[in-house]
């Protein structure tokens, strides 16, 4: 009887010890949080089956303004890596990260190494609207920058789990190879539009326009984040006609009234694209460019 009790006690002790030591088994996936779906999608590609990824901001929400919720802090408290967009786009992420109280969190600025556009040359003040002092933060809309993000993801995942370093490196290289092939396809698809004049609602599309040789000749917002006046809209009407602009790209979280006015007055065609991909799966970043370039290519040269 005593031997039986001793055996039971040993078993219970072993289970208790296992529950303590087994909280994070070696086979556990690396948990990754990202500010944007684009960063999350690339992380899913590079990490493969070894990662569990989620995004804070959704594709149809304005990435400049995300409500900081306690639920986000709780989720981030359980992750190993946080992927920030950087360039002051996702400043709201700082409050989430701080509130998570996750001292082991590896915070990665995915903008490092990007050729940043629209850096202000002088002093930035409120009269200029929501101008980012470090430059335009929408760099992921040049697909070539996706490979830079993939390298950041590879390095962060390798740091979190060195045992899978070879896998992460191979996947990052595979991402680059697939990206280069797709970029060639997208360039060919968009070639007839090279040099045409376009209008955008916000400054989200500067990198996209540069990637495909599109000329942004005006924006619905006179300054980033500043609603247009009647005078500004009339000036845009005149500019659209003078420049023969055929395309207006608008984010879906902005109102339709002003783009529809410009459409009625000039015949310009409005395309509503989310700046970020809809999903966080490994192919969603590529699918986003597939959809946008396919739609725009039908506009003609």
Feature annotation, model-predicted:
Residues 28-301:
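Extracytoplasmic metal-acquisition and chelation regions
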